[in-house]
Amino acid sequence: MGNSVMEKIKGGLVVSCQALEDEPLHSAFIMSKMALAAVQGGAVGIRANTAKDIRAIQSEIDVPIIGIYKKDYDDSDVFITPTLKEVREICETGVEIVAMDATTRKRPHNEDLKEILSAIRKEFPNTLFMADTGSIEDVYYADSLGFDLIGTTLYGYTEETANKNISDDDFSHLKEVLKSTKRPVIAEGKIDSPSKARQVLTLGCYAVVVGGAVTRPQEITTRFTNEIQKIQEERGK
């Protein structure tokens, strides 16, 4: 399954369809229709959160899905498919790719990422596993553990990389990631325009994931209202 899945997403756009519990669009049904709309627009894959959303999306579309499970634990900052329990639950949906936090941070219950990956590969040998990384150190770590794909998902979202953007310094972090691993790199995180998506693919990324810029209306609206607000601020000077 691995090679055919990789061919399907190569050079394409994966749309992240997620809405958390405190967001207006939080609904498996709504996410399934969001995914359908994304595929109709040309998306070659979908990234989705929770088994419930994934199964609803699977009933609507027939493209590869990157599955995750966002869950908070009191004893760790790791929240993207953080423990073996969540990894297994997402694998059981039959998604082609499962992504998980692959930072060097302490995991909930002191679970070990190497042990998680080793155990789950025995249970689901045909599933591909994607490492959501923040720093270059994370990339080396994930590479050494044998992840199938490396994502830049958490760049700008960890304590070490806080407030950084993938496009900073002419995409310097992404360029370093591409030099640091021979595994397929999936660009993800703060890719908020078509031009950015095109540029990361031109640099050599295998595929690109875009989320909020496509599927979070409140974020899209805020970008417009922030610009409009500047008119009032300029007039007030």
UniProtKB/Swiss-Prot annotation:
Any single GO BP term: N-acetylneuraminate catabolic process
Gene3D superfamilies per record: Aldolase class I
Pathway the protein contributes to: Amino-sugar metabolism; N-acetylneuraminate degradation; D-fructose 6-phosphate from N-acetylneuraminate: step 3/5
CDD domains: NanE (cd04729)
Keywords: Carbohydrate metabolism, Isomerase
Annotated catalysed reactions: an N-acyl-D-glucosamine 6-phosphate = an N-acyl-D-mannosamine 6-phosphate
GO molecular function, one term: N-acylglucosamine-6-phosphate 2-epimerase activity
Pfam family, one: NanE
Enzyme class: isomerase
Superkingdom of this protein's organism: Bacteria
Enzyme Commission (EC) number: 5.1.3.9
Gene Ontology CC annotation, any one: cytosol
Family of this protein: Belongs to the NanE family.
UniProt xrefs under NCBIfam families: PRK01130.1 (NF002231)
Known function: Converts N-acetylmannosamine-6-phosphate (ManNAc-6-P) to N-acetylglucosamine-6-phosphate (GlcNAc-6-P).
Protein name, as recorded: Putative N-acetylmannosamine-6-phosphate 2-epimerase
